Amino acid sequence: MSLDQRLQTTSLTIRADERVVLLGASGAGKTTLIKLCNGSLQPSRGALQWRGQPLKRLPRHERRSIGTFWQDLRLVEELSVIQNINSGALGRHGLIWALRNLLGVLEKDACLAVMQEVHLNPSLLKRAVTELSGGQRQRVALARLLRQSPELVLADEPLSALDPVIASDVLDTLLSLPGCLISLHRPDLIHRFERVLGLRNGALVLDAAPDMISKTQLEWLYGRS
C-alpha cells in the first residue's frame, strides 16, 4: 500500500484477522492512514488493496467487509436508534430495503441482539438519537458496526473523551471482531493487541509485537526524547 503526501511512501500489509494498534503523536499521520485504509482518502501515488483487489474498485458487498468506527460517530440525527443501527446492514441490501428502513422498523430482533451486545437498553429502540446521552450515542454507533458484520474494523481515536467504563466497553467490542486497526493515544493499552505500528512525522518507524517495545521507544515515538 503506497500512501499519500502526508505520509512518507511505504508499503504496509495488515491481515484481516490481526488486532493492530496505531500509535503516534498528534499530527503524526494516524488519521490519514485510517482514511486511506477505508477509502475515504485516495493515495496520491500507488494503490490500496483488499484481498488482492484495488479497494476503489470493490463492489459494495465487498467493501462492507471493512467497517469504520468514526470518532464523530456519524449518526443520522433525523433517524431513530433502530434506523441508525440498521444502516449498518445497508451493504447487504438494495434500495427497497433502505427505503423500508426509513419508513418503519425492520429486523427488530437483529437490532435487539446487537444492542444487548453493547449494553444498550432495548427501551431506546425507537428513540430519536438526538435524545440520547453521549455514552448512549457511542453504543448506538457500536451496534451499527456490529450490524455490518465487518471482517476488519478501522477506528480513529475511539476512546478519546470517554469515561473509563464506556471506553472499556468500546475497546472490548472492537477487539471482539475478527480484526482491527485502531489508532490510540494510550500506549498503556498495547498489550491488548497483537501488533503495534508507530508513526512519527508521517513515517512508519515502528512495527513490532507489544512485548518487543520498550518504554524508551514509546517516549521517542511521542517526541519525549
Question: Where is each model-derived feature located?
Answer:
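Conserved beta-strand-loop-alpha-helix hinge in the C-terminal portion
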Residues: 203-225
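Helix-to-loop junction immediately C-terminal to a conserved catalytic motif
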Residues: 38
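Hydrophobic anchor residue at the start of the ABC signature
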Residues: 142
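Catalytic Walker B motif of ABC-type/P-loop ATPase nucleotide-binding domains
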Residues: 153-157
